[in-house]
Amino acid sequence: MLSATKRYLATAAAAAATNTTTTSKAFTNTTSQLGRATLTIKDGPVFNGYSFGANRNVSGEAVFTTSLVGYPESMTDPSYRGQILCFTQPLIGNYGVPSSTAKDQFNLLKYMESPKVQCIGIVVADAALEYSHWTAVESLQQWCKRSGVAAITGVDTRQLVSYLRDKGSSLGRITIGEEYDADEDAAFEDPGAINLVHKVTTKAPFHIACPPQYSKGIHIAVLDCGAKENILRCLVERGASLTVFPYDYPIDKIANKFDGIFISNGPGDPTHCSTTVNNLKKIITNHQDLPIFGICLGHQLLALASGAKTIKLKYGNRAHNIPAIDLITGNCHITSQNHGYAVDANTLSENWQPYFTNLNDLSNEGMIHKYQPIFSTQFHPEAKGGPLDTSFLFDKFFDNINVYKKSNGLNLPPVENSLLVDILPKERVE
């Protein structure tokens, strides 16, 4: 008896021979329609390939992600601001790109992590110029061109990633054209030398109201260092309304008007955010019962505010499958990560203790205050993309908020009746 697979292949072959069936269009990755492009690593190798994105030259920090899926989420993640992102997955673009403007029931972007592409360029081994997925509205090539993102395909990404792994994250540039002099004296721009958070934060406070059917009467202040949409979604879907502030807003002056403080992810060197660090110091000192939760850059800023130090990793951790151990329970979780800096756990003060540790490189992945309801993680519990193993940390934050509200007998006015909320816009201010 023929197996199901053999029967399918036999039927498909017969149908193809008689041309009596319609088949989906094959993925065509021909480079005949593409112009030449070059990726140059500063003081390193040069890779020739083909341009399938915007016709512009770009430079920035070259980094890589080993994530198998989620390229729309990665490319719109503000933590990738100013970077040239290399995908180790050989074929990228085969399921296209979904709508960049579609919203969910919370008025948050449904598929993207921010309103626009944040990385300045992408590098792939094989770009799928055709796509197939029910949510897709355009190809990766069309999206890159429309968004002004340089994109190069036909690159030996294994060689590139091996170099970055051994030498560390390096500056790179993508140039478009038939001929390019690799020795040309052109600047390699270092995004790490500037305050990237200032470029991705909201320019003014705005409010996200929790729909009545979800609301639990909780009001959280969010410091937007480049917050991913799914982080905001994880807070709202648990019953909180959010007031989102620019990263350097003097939140310490109004912290007592909120049930909790959240510090988001974001790009670049945390030491550039000294104003935020000083504001957090005041909150930790003057509002000792107030629940605080930080993710990624938010974790690093809390660490700096507590007196600890941060370090730049050799090539960073950017993947959807990194194991991190909970040092309190001993449980191991698979986490989604995207960062080039980390907290030096050896510099934590006596009031803090490590919460999670990366089992690949033993870098710090979280910390928790011994006496106050404050904790933070280097990894992304909201995922998108990635596993949901650590989504319980949002529940932990809300548990802390409920204890805080109950123990302090808080009876704040309804969130939506606040004068502050009434005058704020309802979406991010670019």
Curated annotation (Swiss-Prot):
EC numbers for this chain: 6.3.5.5
Glutamine amidotransferase type-1 domain segment(s): 219-407
Top-level enzyme category: ligase
Catalytic activity: hydrogencarbonate + L-glutamine + 2 ATP + H2O = carbamoyl phosphate + L-glutamate + 2 ADP + phosphate + 2 H(+)
Pathway(s) where this gene product acts: Amino-acid biosynthesis; L-arginine biosynthesis; carbamoyl phosphate from bicarbonate: step 1/1
Biological process according to GO: 'de novo' pyrimidine nucleobase biosynthetic process; glutamine metabolic process; L-arginine biosynthetic process; pyrimidine nucleotide biosynthetic process
A single GO cellular-component term on record: mitochondrial matrix
A Gene Ontology molecular function term of the record: ATP binding
One Pfam family in the UniProt entry: CPSase_sm_chain
CDD domains linked to this entry: GATase1_CPSase
Transit peptide: 1-9
Active-site residues annotated for this sequence: C296, H380, E382
Sorted UniProt keywords: Amino-acid biosynthesis, Arginine biosynthesis, ATP-binding, Glutamine amidotransferase, Ligase, Mitochondrion, Nucleotide-binding, Transit peptide
UniProt xrefs under PROSITE patterns: GATASE_TYPE_1
Subcellular compartments: Mitochondrion matrix
Family listed: Belongs to the CarA family.
Xref: PANTHER family: CARBAMOYL-PHOSPHATE SYNTHASE SMALL CHAIN (PTHR43418:SF7), MULTIFUNCTIONAL TRYPTOPHAN BIOSYNTHESIS PROTEIN-RELATED (PTHR43418)
Role of this protein: Small subunit of the arginine-specific carbamoyl phosphate synthase (CPSase). CPSase catalyzes the formation of carbamoyl phosphate from the ammonia moiety of glutamine, carbonate, and phosphate donated by ATP, the first step of the arginine biosynthetic pathway. The small subunit (glutamine amidotransferase) binds and cleaves glutamine to supply the large subunit with the substrate ammonia.
Subunit text: Heterodimer composed of 2 chains; the small (or glutamine) chain promotes the hydrolysis of glutamine to ammonia, which is used by the large (or ammonia) chain to synthesize carbamoyl phosphate.
Protein name: Carbamoyl phosphate synthase arginine-specific small chain
Organism: Candida albicans (strain SC5314 / ATCC MYA-2876) (Yeast)
Gene name tied to this protein: CPA1
